[in-house]
Amino acid sequence: NETLYIPIMKGIDDKEIIILREKGNVMNSNLKGDVKIVINIQNSTHFKRDGLNLHFEKEISLKESLCGFNFIIDHISGKQLRYNSEVGVPTKSGLIKAIPGFGMEREGNKGSLCIKFNIKYPDKLTAEQIDKIKEIL
């Protein structure tokens, strides 16, 4: 019997295989087998991973998309990131904003945090609201 210590590197991928050479069954006095470990990562966050990039979806209102907004993201690093939209520049539905350096890290490389904005439109507008929008736009 031997206790095996598995080196899990930062940023390891789901389904990645770690091979520990000659740590498996003894075939004969000169030959030992390998131990293969398959990594199974269970995501319990609101982020989705794509390589080194992290993806996050943010729903905003029509008003926020037109007038600007800000919000805080609780990042997996434990840091809180504040996102401020650009005032005067409408945020389009489906826009993806990449923030370099806030993705996963592996072997000195860092991915991006990619925020996709989805706009929630009102179910109905009153005649008065429609007139105001027409007047403004």
Give names to the regions the model predicted.
Residues 1-137:
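Intrinsically disordered, low-complexity linker/assembly segments
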